[in-house]
């Protein structure tokens, strides 16, 4: 990635996971948002595929859990210390990426996208994270194991491997589910 970044001559760099499909016009929309709102990093959490029962059952809960751990509204506030990004789709100012230490600063990060957002915010720059159907993931989760591994990598890491915090978050999710109007 560092070798590729050295060849970048554009003011913005688009970082995409290989399984992400973007709707027509979304890159220009991200660019416009970045320019109009003076954002150094714009990130979209891609819509998961929802092709099988386990995905339809667990992926909405994972997205909800991710938003509990990384509240988008707080992450998007310049004064907030909370930083978050979804690595599937990130448009970042090339200079900001370099200022943040580029990819070498992420080599030991367990959650590289959120770490990148944190580096950029610490540099005094603004970030944005949103949900969108304009970025769609084609990465399938055929069973419980790959979903559990993803949750363990993201959520459990953010909770500092605390079973107590995991149980609290789980109880909050259950309470919100039970309190939801159906």
Where is each model-derived feature located?
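Glycine-rich, basic loop-to-helix element that forms the pyrophosphate-binding segment
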Residues: 1-8, 29
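Short acidic donor-binding/metal-coordinating loop in glycosyltransferase active sites
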Residues: 4, 10, 18-20, 112
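Short aromatic/hydrophobic "clamp" motif used to bind/position activated sugar donors
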Residues: 13
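Acidic donor-binding/catalytic loop of UDP-sugar-dependent glycosyltransferases
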Residues: 18-33
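Catalytic donor/gating beta->alpha subdomain of glycosyltransferases that bind UDP-sugars
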Residues: 34, 41-66, 98, 103-166
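Short glycine- and hydrophobic/aromatic-rich loop-to-beta-strand nucleating segment
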Residues: 83-92, 96, 114
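Alpha-helical bilayer-embedded segments of polytopic membrane proteins, i.e.
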Residues: 158-182
């Amino acid at each position: 990635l560092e070798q590729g970044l050295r060849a970048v001559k554009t003011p913005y760099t688009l970082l995409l996971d290989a399984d992400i499909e973007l709707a027509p016009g979304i890159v220009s929309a991200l660019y416009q948002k970045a320019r109009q709102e003076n954002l150094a990093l714009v990130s979209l959490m891609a819509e998961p595929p929802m092709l099988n029962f386990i995905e339809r059952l667990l992926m909405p809960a994972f997205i909800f859990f991710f938003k509990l751990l990384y509240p988008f509204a707080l992450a998007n506030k310049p004064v907030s210390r909370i930083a978050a990004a979804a690595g599937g789709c990130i448009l970042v100012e090339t200079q900001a990426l370099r200022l943040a230490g580029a990819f070498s600063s992420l080599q030991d990060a367990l959650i590289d996208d959120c770490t990148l957002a944190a580096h950029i915010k610490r540099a005094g720059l603004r970030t944005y994270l949103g949900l969108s159907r304009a970025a769609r993931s084609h990465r399938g989760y055929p069973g419980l194991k790959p979903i559990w591994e993803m949750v363990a990598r993201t959520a459990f890491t953010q909770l500092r491997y605390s079973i107590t915090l995991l149980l609290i978050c789980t109880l909050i999710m259950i309470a919100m589910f039970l309190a939801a109007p159906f």
